[in-house]
């Protein structure tokens, strides 16, 4: 496949991916149709670079990365260290216990912590907890 840039890549993507992207919320035409730089080559701190090398200040700051910025050196170092150790098994890693303890220490109202792999799983868990606590089957949800 020929390498495409920006809007041309996005237009092509829309022919093979419904909506042009794999996430429901990140469609370029929602922001600036035909001009929005839909794809980025790299990101560091609060900046992103498009496929042509143009640098932008990311005013959206993504979801979650706004706390530390993109490509945080300390985070990258820790992630790479753990990837090299082998990070994909069916077994549990001890770090989840240490992280759970930190979460509980920061939230005195919590006596336990549970982690999920993504938003959908977190929502499903929240709904189960709501049903258990309220003894009601229906749960109002907006989002």
Specify the residue positions occupied by each region the protein language model found.
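Active-site-adjacent loop/helix segments that line or gate small-molecule/cofactor pockets in enzymes
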Residues: 2-42
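Short, hydrophobic/aliphatic alpha-helical segments
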Residues: 4-12, 48-54, 104-105
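Short amphipathic alpha-helical surface micro-motifs
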Residues: 5-7, 28-30, 50, 95-97, ...
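N-proximal short alpha-helices
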Residues: 18-22, 48-49, 72, 76, ...
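Short active-site-proximal "capping" loops at secondary-structure junctions
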Residues: 30, 45, 64-66
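Active-site and channel-lining beta-strand-loop segments
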Residues: 37-58
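Glycine-rich loop-to-alpha-helix module at the N-terminal edge of alpha/beta enzyme cores
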Residues: 55-138
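Substrate-binding/gating loop at the entrance of the active-site cleft, primarily
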Residues: 142-143
């Amino acid at each position: 496949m020929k390498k495409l840039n920006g809007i041309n890549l996005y237009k092509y993507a829309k022919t093979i991916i419904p909506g042009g992207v794999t996430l429901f919320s990140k469609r370029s035409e929602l922001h600036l149709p035909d001009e929005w730089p839909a794809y980025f080559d790299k990101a560091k701190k609060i900046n992103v670079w498009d496929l042509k090398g143009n640098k932008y200040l990311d005013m959206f700051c993504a979801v979650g990365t706004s706390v530390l910025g993109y490509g945080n050196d300390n985070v990258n170092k820790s992630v790479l260290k753990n990837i090299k150790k082998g990070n994909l098994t069916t077994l549990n890693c001890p770090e989840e216990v240490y992280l759970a303890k930190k979460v509980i220490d920061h939230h005195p109202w919590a006596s336990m912590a549970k982690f999920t792999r993504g938003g959908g799983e977190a929502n499903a868990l929240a709904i189960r907890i709501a049903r258990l606590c309220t003894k009601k089957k229906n749960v109002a949800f907006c989002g």
